[in-house]
A protein has these predicted regions:
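Small-residue helix-packing and pore-constriction motifs in hydrophobic alpha-helices
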Residues: 9, 20-73, 82-93, 103-114, ...
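The feature captures the hydrophobic core positions of alpha-helical coiled-coils
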Residues: 5-8, 15
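ATP-dependent adenylate-handling ligase core
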Residues: 96
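Juxtamembrane/start-of-transmembrane alpha-helix segments at the extracytoplasmic/lumenal side
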Residues: 13-19
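Structural motif
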Residues: 15, 77, 116-123
């Protein structure tokens, strides 16, 4: 909890420095009703995360890594935890570990940020991608959602598979984007995605999201 408090203080300092002229958005992040909503969301998300974990140790470890990913990328912990929870069972069926699920989650989350996806678009991609993993293949509506809102994810997938981006649609239509190809391809590009995102300027919105995550982390 001390670590969470220190993280919160750090995030508060950063966002105060960058939030000049955006007092409305800053105040909204600390509205009592919103904080209560965050607490409820924390409980709900972690209930799903526990169900997706095979042990209490795995739950605790995954929870902390997901929070680290969220704070590093300025993305909502709830979105990242939801992707992990939805994908874990199906990925295990294909022989992947919890660490692999976390890496794919980070690749998707980082790719969405680089792509400039809105909250609604990111939510749609997370839902469709997790459904694709459950089916064992990325195609149809699932591929279209990622292709439309997560351009950087699609380019990373193409690079990881060693094919041209333009060829992915035909591969998706032919059912060739199977989980055993998609997962390692995305994981192989994680370092590139991290470096690319690290070079991007942080926005006020990113800062507010980090503060919201930090409030949630007080329960860690």
């Amino acid at each position: 909890q001390r670590r969470a408090l220190a993280e919160l203080n750090s995030q508060l300092t950063e966002i105060r420095a960058s939030a000049a002229g955006t007092a409305g958005a800053f105040a909204g992040a600390f509205a009592t009703g919103h904080l209560i909503s965050l607490a409820d969301e924390w409980s709900s998300v972690n209930a799903r995360l526990k169900q997706a974990s095979q042990s209490s140790d795995e739950f605790s470890s995954s929870q902390k890594v997901l929070m680290d990913i969220s704070q590093r990328t300025g993305t909502a912990f709830s979105d990242n935890a939801a992707l992990f929870a939805r994908s874990a069972a199906s990925m295990r069926e294909y022989g992947y570990s919890a660490d692999d699920v976390l890496k794919v989650t980070e690749a998707i989350s980082t790719g969405l940020k680089i792509s400039g996806a809105s909250t609604a678009e990111a939510g749609s991609v997370i839902t469709q991608f997790s459904q694709a993993l459950a089916q064992g293949v990325l195609r149809g509506e699932e591929f279209n959602s990622v292709n439309e809102s997560g351009d950087r994810i699609v380019r990373a997938l193409a690079a990881g598979m060693g094919v041209a981006r333009k060829d992915l649609k035909a591969m998706a239509d032919d059912g060739k984007l199977t989980a055993d190809k998609v997962v390692p391809a995305l994981i192989s590009q994680l370092g590139v995605l991290r470096d690319e995102y690290a070079a991007m300027p942080e926005t006020v919105s990113d800062g507010i999201t980090k503060v919201e995550n930090a409030f949630m982390a007080l329960s860690l």
